[in-house]
Amino acid sequence: MIRPFEEQDSADVVALSLRAWGPVHDSLREVMGDELFDLRHRPDWKAQQQRDVESVLSDDANRAWVAEQGQGVVGFAAATIRPEDDLGEVLMVAVDPSNQGRGLGTELTEVATDWIRESGMSVAFISTGGDPGHRPARRTYAKAGYRELPIAYYFKAL
């Protein structure tokens, strides 16, 4: 069941996001190398990810949803709209590893996209990495009807 996020879900959402994004960060470390990865994810990726998730969940401009199974939260998505640009962004999607590969990420992405559409926006977008760790996310977004735009980001340790 997917329902709107409630404040009491926050700790569960943070915990599942850390589990879900562990393999992604392992892949990023491999692609970026230890030095650059550590510089980019100070003090460590888990602390940064927790701050990022908590920030998205606490921002009143955003909307979030959770997927429940049994008594637990097993996935979430968050989105925002930018009326001045006539677009919305799916900010985050995460599914607990034990529930991945069953279409839940696509379903959460579609719920967020529906909210963007219902908010009157003409375009929705989502961004993700091109590294191997983000391959499941890219498949999820393609299944939800998003088209990939090849964009490259370059980083350099200073």
Across the structure, where does each feature detected by a protein language model lie?
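A cross-family glycoside hydrolase active-site/sugar-binding cleft signature
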Residues: L91, S127, A152
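Residue-level "edge-of-site" marker
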Residues: E84, G129, Y154
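Conserved acetyl-CoA-binding loop-helix of GNAT-fold acetyltransferases
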Residues: M92-V95, G101-D114, E118, R139, ...
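Conserved beta-strand-loop-alpha-helix junction that forms the acyl-donor binding cleft
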Residues: P97-Q100, F125-A137, A157-L158
